Design a protein with these regions (language model features):
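Intrinsically disordered, low-complexity acidic/polar segments
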Residues: 13, 38, 81-83
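Long, contiguous binding/interaction regions
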Residues: 87, 95-100, 104-105
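Short, internal acidic amphipathic alpha-helical interface segments
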Residues: 30-69
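Ser/Thr-rich, low-complexity intrinsically disordered terminal regions
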Residues: 1-34
Length: 113
């Protein structure tokens, strides 16, 4: 597991964890706790997450019912020789996607009117 943290334009910090497959030819990039969902906002956040999943092709948003948070996940396959380039690109795209989607998530929670 590799952990990286960056500041975005709308949210900071963005903590990313890279989970590499046992064959070292795939990776799952996960950003846990993008937003904490208060009681009574589950339906609103599920609608927002579904909308974001329909909009973003390579990122998956999901609501964790156990800890009441939203996670963003991106996966990629690669050859050993291009792992650095692919993981860097994945990280940049993930930061952009989270930055772009954060206002929608916060609006669903009633933080932005």
């Amino acid at each position: 597991v590799v952990s990286v943290s960056f500041d975005g334009n709308t949210i900071s910090p963005i903590k990313m964890l890279f989970f590499f497959g046992t064959d070292s030819q795939d990776v799952s990039l996960q950003c846990f706790n993008v937003v904490k969902v208060p009681e009574g906002k589950t339906e609103a956040i599920l609608k927002a997450v579904n909308g974001l999943n329909a909009h973003y092709r390579f990122a998956k948003f999901y609501f964790d019912v156990d800890d009441k948070t939203v996670t963003v996940q991106m996966d990629a396959c690669f050859r050993t020789h291009d792992v650095g380039e692919i993981c860097t690109e994945l990280m940049i795209r993930c930061i952009q996607i989270i930055d772009d989607s954060y206002p929608s998530l916060m609006k669903a929670l009633g933080a932005f009117q």
